[in-house]
Amino acid sequence: MKKPSLCSSEIVYRGFFDIRKDQIMRSDGQLFDYTCMVLHLDAAVVVAQTSDGLFVVNREYRQPAGDWVLGCPGGRLEEGEDPIKGGQRELFEETGYWSDDISIIGCCYPLPSLLDQKIYFLHAKNAILKGGQSLDPFEFINIELKTEKQLHQEIQAGSKIDGVMCAALWYKSLATC
């Protein structure tokens, strides 16, 4: 199967993210429209652990879900920002925790059918509380410390979980095999 060719592309909405409408042509000449979100910046998500192995996680109010959702600290990288530096920044801003022992454990496109964003997954070992939160006005985050067993139980119980956290924990499990 051949990759379709792009015939035209138009931004139909500009905002925190853009919406782009592309016209694509299949190898058989058939045209179709494809709409996607353009986020412009990649993101970093941090699996942070304290020296005693507890996971530093966020219980964050997410307006689209209409509820509190359990996830990992993280967010959009600044233009040209190194993923490790961005991960450290996001971890500190959202939780007040800091780690100098941080590394990339994977990356992926979380929703390539709709988004152009790539997420870098990082593991921050020996995270220590160095300050308070410095949240954006639209962020509502409670910090929780959990064991790996508690995280697994919450996921298995069907709690409201950010799927990106599940991917982050999976990448962490691969990095420690």
Regions found by a protein language model. Give the residues of each.
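Nudix hydrolase/Nudix homology domain
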Residues: 67-68, 79, 136-177
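Conserved Nudix-box catalytic region and its N-terminal flanking loop in Nudix hydrolases
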Residues: 2-3, 37-40, 44-89, 135-137
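Conserved beta-strand segments that form the floor/walls of ligand-binding pockets within enzyme
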Residues: 56, 71, 90-92, 103-104, ...
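Active-site-adjacent beta-strand/loop module that shapes the phosphate/pyrophosphate-binding cleft
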Residues: 21-28, 111-130, 144
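A short coil-to-beta-strand element that immediately follows conserved catalytic motifs
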Residues: 5, 98-105
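Short, solvent-exposed loop/turn elements at beta->coil junctions and helix N-caps
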Residues: 9-10, 107-111
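Beta-rich strand-turn-strand
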Residues: 81-85, 94-100
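Acidic, metal-coordinating catalytic segment for phosphate/diphosphate chemistry
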Residues: 8-45, 51
